[in-house]
């Protein structure tokens, strides 16, 4: 095997060094034996670099072209009437209705297996390279093991149970029939991947310096291990007796999803999350109180609700000394670099390129900057195409932790309250009213009261009708003395339903990744580079709380390295340990004791917390499936503002009527509310099924016998 000649693609632009090391720019082909590759430090590290490079195509945060799963029941994408760069006409609707075929979007499958094969080869041969010290060699092996486990995890999450290669990788001297291997049960896949992450964690460092920030650390390996085990404990994979699970079998007819519920799996997930927490390396990003306004881009801190508890204490026990709005938005908008973001367990560094152009290469579609270009308003030369559903908008709390009046009233939920009206002139002039909407009365007038007095994460994420955009990178001149931009979505307005498909379908925009300087207008415009939040500490904290909530007895579980034993049981103190940091950073009061005392109520609240905290991070798509909530949530009609309503009328009284009509939720046309159970897992392509004779198709998809 070692003397077999391989085509080794070598990067001509340096080694694995910087935070954007995943950009493999130019290659040349050279015939090299594996013996020669792994006797050279240069070639060895370039092999590892190439192993990493496939991560560029397996991202969680990007727009429609890169990660269409980022659009679940929380976000919508307007491409109706358009043919995408990928050649798919009106692709969003096709995705929603699961009208695609088995060849659709197989990028994850293709690149993950290439990465797995590369990692297997690296692990088989790195020990022969005597140019490294034992410590450096152990780190490199741990990196390769992490990357291989990551690719396996990406496949398992998307495709469900998968084949697992032998440790040494495939023997390419065998025929296709001899190489064919069956799918392994979900729990076996999860246990194997979790074990691989644990092995990697032992030899990975706690931290990396700034030049190696996108290489994995111990926390990254342990964090993904916790995610893997949490999914394995979830209802779709644990004790699932429905017809879908019964049809998901290997080539011998054996079930691939367990019909027997195992509570201990929740304990394993909780212990894995606790392994991360016990590192004492991570904490949620938090910004100090801003006592003086620095303009519309950086407003004075809006004091959170005085709950008598969190409001009286400083971070991390309370929010008296932090700015929750700035704390949350800086995680995503580029204000924090990969090296300063204290809650990032893993990132690929700067995901994508600064700016986006349709003529540029396809891989730039796998970037946050592409997403920002799609959600910026037309007035900033954005594409204005990403919107938030009314259901997602309603999920955000009021600043005091209560529900917004009228929440979910159109989809059979809520408490019978009605949605509030429009902010009047007198209310807009009252500086104590809805300060988070803007410090000047001029920008508060005419905004719906349903957007007033909401929690800080709302203002960091929601581009409601009348929202102010910073656009600070633009150059202002005497002929262009504009100091802010307020975007309205009324029909025929610049950012509303006017022409083509460049308007938000629901009339509720999304701006979680937008920096106050972001704009594509003018020569000096720019989109601030973003750091991909691939895995955050907030996720680990809520994973811990979710898993712990499901325990009905006590468990003793060893840590990842066997050096300590975790004693696990459901208790309010431990549940608060997972929930409190997220709620405090959000500037929200604690849940009532009843939520901690009642397992079902806690589960309901935790699901809502995840819905809010991780919107636009490709979590909702998978969360709804693993919880088996997808059918319930996807079949609720999608509501939003009435985009057919213009702001008409010659008097304020007449305009008021149109404002109310616009903000009265209606069902969004062309966005079907449907769930098809075959979309629990992605299909295998016809090519792959023919290549691997023992690979069985996921239920509901063509098997191509």
Annotated model-derived regions:
Residues 348, 356-468:
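Segments forming glycine/polar-rich beta-alpha architectures that bind adenosine-containing cofactors
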Residues 18-21, 112-115, 192-194, 277-278, ...:
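Long, intrinsically disordered, low-complexity segments
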Residues 1-29:
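Bacterial Sec-dependent N-terminal signal peptides
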Residues 41, 45-49, 53-58, 63, ...:
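Conserved, well-structured interaction surfaces
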Residues 156-157, 163, 228-240, 550-554:
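Short coil/turn linking the two alpha-helices of tandem helical-hairpin repeats
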């Amino acid at each position: 095997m070692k003397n077999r000649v391989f085509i080794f693609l070598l990067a001509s632009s340096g080694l694995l060094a910087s935070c954007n090391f995943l950009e493999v720019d130019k290659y040349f082909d050279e015939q090299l034996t594996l013996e020669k590759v792994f006797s050279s430090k240069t070639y060895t590290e370039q092999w590892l670099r190439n192993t990493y490079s496939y991560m560029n195509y397996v991202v969680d945060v990007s727009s429609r072209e890169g990660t269409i799963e980022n659009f679940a029941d929380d976000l919508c994408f307007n491409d109706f009437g358009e043919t995408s760069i990928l050649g798919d006409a009106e692709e969003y609707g096709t995705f929603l209705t699961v009208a695609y075929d088995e060849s659709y979007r197989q990028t994850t499958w293709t690149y993950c297996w290439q990465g797995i094969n590369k990692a297997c080869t690296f692990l088989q041969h790195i020990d022969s390279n005597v140019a490294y010290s034992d410590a450096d060699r152990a780190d490199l092996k741990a990196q390769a093991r992490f990357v291989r486990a990551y690719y396996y995890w990406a496949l398992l999450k998307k495709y469900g149970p998968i084949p697992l290669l032998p440790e040494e990788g495939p023997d390419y001297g065998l025929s296709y029939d001899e190489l064919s291997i069956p799918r392994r049960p979900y729990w076996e896949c999860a246990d194997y991947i979790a074990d691989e992450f644990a092995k990697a964690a032992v030899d990975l460092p706690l931290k990396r310096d700034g030049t190696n920030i996108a290489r994995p650390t111990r926390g990254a390996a342990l964090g993904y291990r916790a995610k893997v085990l949490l999914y394995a404990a979830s209802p779709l994979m644990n004790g699932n007796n429905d017809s879908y699970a019964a049809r998901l079998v290997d080539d011998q007819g054996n079930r691939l999803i367990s019909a027997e519920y195992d509570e201990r799996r929740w304990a394993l997930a909780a212990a894995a999350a606790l392994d991360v927490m016990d590192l004492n390396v991570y904490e949620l990003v938090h910004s100090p109180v801003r006592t003086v306004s620095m303009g519309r881009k950086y407003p004075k801190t809006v004091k959170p609700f005085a709950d008598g508890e969190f409001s009286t204490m400083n971070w991390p026990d309370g929010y008296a000394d932090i700015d929750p709005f700035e704390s949350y938005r800086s995680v995503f908008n580029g204000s924090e670099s990969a090296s300063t973001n204290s809650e990032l367990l893993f990132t690929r560094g700067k995901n994508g390129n600064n700016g986006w152009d349709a003529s540029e290469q396809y891989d730039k579609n796998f970037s946050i900057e592409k997403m920002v270009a799609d959600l910026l308003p037309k007035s900033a030369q954005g594409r204005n195409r990403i919107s938030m559903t009314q259901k997602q908008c309603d999920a955000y709390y009021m600043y005091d932790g209560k529900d917004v009046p009228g929440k979910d009233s159109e989809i059979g939920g809520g408490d019978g309250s009605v949605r509030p009206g429009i902010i009047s002139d007198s209310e807009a002039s009252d500086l104590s009213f809805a300060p988070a909407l803007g410090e000047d009365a001029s920008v508060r007038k005419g905004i719906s009261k349903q957007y007033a007095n909401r929690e800080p994460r709302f203002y960091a994420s929601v581009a409601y009708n009348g929202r102010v955009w910073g656009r600070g990178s633009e150059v202002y001149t005497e002929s262009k003395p504009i100091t802010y931009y307020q975007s309205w979505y009324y029909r025929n307005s610049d950012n509303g339903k006017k022409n083509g498909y460049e308007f938000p379908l629901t009339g509720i925009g999304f701006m979680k990744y937008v920096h106050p300087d972001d704009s594509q207008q003018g020569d000096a415009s720019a989109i601030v580079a973003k750091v991909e939040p691939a895995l955050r500490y907030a996720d680990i904290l809520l994973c811990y709380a979710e898993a712990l909530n499901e325990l009905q007895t006590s468990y003793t579980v060893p840590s990842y390295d066997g050096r300590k034993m975790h004693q696990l049981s459901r208790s309010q103190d431990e549940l608060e340990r997972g929930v409190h940091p997220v709620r405090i950073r959000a500037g929200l009061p604690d849940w009532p004791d009843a939520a901690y005392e009642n397992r079902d109520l806690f589960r309901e609240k935790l699901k809502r917390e995840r819905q809010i905290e991780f919107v636009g991070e490709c979590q909702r798509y998978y969360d709804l499936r693993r919880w088996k909530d997808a059918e319930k949530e996807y079949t609720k009609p999608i509501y939003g503002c009435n985009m057919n309503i213009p702001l008409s009328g010659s008097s304020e009284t007449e305009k008021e009527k149109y404002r109310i009509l616009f903000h009265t939720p209606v069902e969004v046309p062309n966005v079907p509310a449907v769930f098809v159970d075959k979309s629990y897992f992605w299909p295998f392509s016809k090519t792959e099924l023919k290549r691997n004779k023992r690979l069985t198709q996921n239920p509901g998809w063509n098997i191509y016998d």
